[in-house]
Each structure stands twice: as C-alpha cells, then as structure tokens.
C-alpha cells in the first residue's frame, strides 16, 4: 500500500501533481521488478489514475470515497478492488474533539452505506475491503471500543482491515512515544485478532 499524502492528524492536503510525483516512480519501480499486488493510498481520482498506469491494481481511500466524486466511477470503470475506510472529518481537523453517540453503530452505518454505494456503482462486493479507521477522527476510547468489537463489523459481509501499525494509540496504551519503537505493540494488537475470519492487518 503506497501513499504520497500524509493523513496523520493535522496534515494538510497536498496538490495532485505533488502526490503523483511522490508515488509514481515508486510504483513504477516495484511493478517492474515484482508481480506483488500494489494498492495506492489516495483520495484523488487523478492520483489513482496515475498509479494505475504505473502498475497499481487497487485503491485504498481513507475518506471512504467521500472526498473526490470522480474516484468511485473510475474504480468501477477499471474494475479495481477497493478499500473503504471510515473517518470523521479531514486529517487537518479530524482529531478536534471527535464525538459519537454510538461509535459502533455510526461507523457500521457509514461503512454499510458506502459499501452499498460501491456495489450500486458496479464494484463487486467480493472486491471490497472495509476499514474501521483506527485513529481517524477518534479518541482513545473510540479506538479501543472499535478494536475490541471488530467482530461486530463482520456483519458487513466483506473482509476487514485493521490498521494499527505504529499509530499513536500504541503510544497511549503502552507509553511508546517513538513510532519506530511501536512495532511490538502493533503486533500485539494484531495478534489478539488472528482468530477472526477475513481480517487483514497493516
């Protein structure tokens, strides 16, 4: 999964040209030397198109296909597998006191709605992955509730992606400030969910 635009809390959107400049040579290099599937992490259709031309074969949109209205039709046209993620707000403001009445229901309803939208647009359900969006517009309590209850989201009927690798939640749980030192905590969180069916980890 290759991305050129930071989506960490507080990060600002960069231009399409800059995002393409960052990812295109990397994807081209990898695809020329390996048959490994490459996913592009982007919210923008023009970036996804450039990545596809360079060798990417999947789109991972952290906005859940709400940022660029042209991206969904493009993915449908190219028959690309997709990952749809829940986030609340944009990276620059998503951690400004996020609130939910019921985090499980609200995230589930969003993902269910977006999955149905993807299917209606022509993307087969078996080509869709759902991501609960750990750290995207959620505080520690929200994140822990989602992680502990991730089996709830199997009701969506698609594989689930649990992305916790080196995120700040590991620091808040284990007091590991340097992201480079959070790998053990990341593995521990993922390991506790290994018995769940159709769950992917990043």
Where are these regions (language model features)?
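Glycine-rich, proline-tolerant flexible connector loops at the mouths of alpha/beta enzymes
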Residues: 1-22, 134
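Hydrophobic faces of well-ordered beta-strands that scaffold small-molecule active sites
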Residues: 2, 38-40, 59-60, 82-84, ...
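Active-site beta-loop-alpha junctions enriched in small/polar residues
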Residues: 5-7, 43-45, 62-64, 87-88, ...
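Conserved anion-binding
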Residues: 7-8, 66-135
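Conserved small/polar residues in nucleotide/adenosyl-binding loops
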Residues: 192-198
């Amino acid at each position: 999964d290759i991305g050129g635009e930071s989506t960490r809390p507080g990060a600002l959107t960069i231009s399409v040209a800059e995002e393409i400049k960052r990812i295109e040579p990397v994807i081209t290099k990898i695809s020329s030397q390996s048959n490994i599937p490459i996913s592009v992490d982007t919210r923008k259709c023009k970036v996804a198109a450039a990545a596809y031309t360079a060798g990417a074969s999947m789109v991972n949109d952290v906005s859940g296909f709400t940022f660029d209205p042209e991206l969904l039709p493009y993915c449908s046209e190219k028959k690309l597998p997709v990952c749809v993620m829940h986030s609340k707000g944009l990276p620059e403001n998503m951690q400004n006191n996020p609130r939910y009445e019921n985090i499980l229901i609200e995230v589930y309803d969003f993902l269910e709605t977006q999955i149905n939208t993807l299917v209606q647009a022509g993307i087969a359900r078996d080509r869709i992955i759902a991501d609960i969006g750990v750290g995207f517009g959620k505080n520690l309590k929200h994140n822990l509730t989602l992680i502990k209850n991730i089996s709830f989201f199997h009701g969506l009927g698609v594989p689930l992606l649990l992305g916790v690798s080196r995120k700040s939640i590991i620091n808040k749980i284990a007091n590991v400030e340097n992201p480079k030192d959070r790998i053990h905590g990341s593995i521990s969180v993922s390991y506790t969910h290994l018995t769940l069916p159709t769950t992917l980890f990043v």
